[in-house]
Amino acid sequence: MQNSNSFPDWHGTTILAVRKNGSTVIAGDGQVSMGPTVVKGNARKVRRLAGGKVVAGFAGATADAFTLIERLEAKLEQYPDQLARACVDLAKDWRTDRYLRRLEAMLLVADADSIFTVTGVGDVLEPGESTGGGSVAAIGSGGNYALAAAKALIDQDLTAEEIARKAMGIAAEICVYTNGNLTVESL
């Protein structure tokens, strides 16, 4: 769903990407909700793409997200080892195609070098480096909680995966649309 400002509303899930010391991790919770009801607790919202060189997580309508993941895979085949170009091309199509612009989802995509948030309003956002080194990005209803927790932990003596797991745990304690059943993929 979109609000009156044409920015996507944050959907009921949490996806977090953490990059630190050459390691990149994307973690996603497993909860699927329909309104106030939890219908599934172990969904996989994080996937490997491009022969395992790219990881993508999604928030929003599941069918829409799978459509976008398929489109991203096609872009990655068209532009091998060029994640930024594939994401920009996907965002351009998503924004201009009459069918695609109705899709209600967001993607968080990473390879070994970069993290991107891709939205249906044409945004391809790459996070800057955090004050403690490394970078973090998050989407979904619990995204801001996970993002804040990860930023607070980034300068600690923790790996990217440890930061992601701790931050997602904090988000799950705060956001009712996020659970602690995580899928974690590392690059």
Curated annotation (Swiss-Prot):
InterPro entries: ATP-dep_Prtase_HsIV_su (IPR022281), Ntn_hydrolases_N (IPR029055), Proteasome_sua/b (IPR001353), Proteasome_suB-type (IPR023333). Keywords: Allosteric enzyme, Cytoplasm, Hydrolase, Metal-binding, Protease, Sodium, Threonine protease. Its EC number is 3.4.25.2. Allosterically activated by HslU binding. Na(+) binds at A172, C175, T178. One of its GO terms (molecular function) is threonine-type endopeptidase activity. Pfam families: Proteasome. It is an enzyme of class 3 (hydrolase). It catalyses: ATP-dependent cleavage of peptide bonds with broad specificity. One of its GO terms (cellular component) is proteasome core complex. PANTHER family: ATP-DEPENDENT PROTEASE SUBUNIT HSLV (PTHR32194:SF7), METALLOPROTEASE TLDD (PTHR32194). Protease subunit of a proteasome-like degradation complex believed to be a general protein degrading machinery. NCBIfam families: ATP_dep_HslV, PRK05456.1. A double ring-shaped homohexamer of HslV is capped on each side by a ring-shaped HslU homohexamer. The assembly of the HslU/HslV complex is dependent on binding of ATP. This is ATP-dependent protease subunit HslV. It comes from Caulobacter sp. (strain K31). The lineage of its organism: Bacteria, Pseudomonadati, Pseudomonadota, Alphaproteobacteria, Caulobacterales.
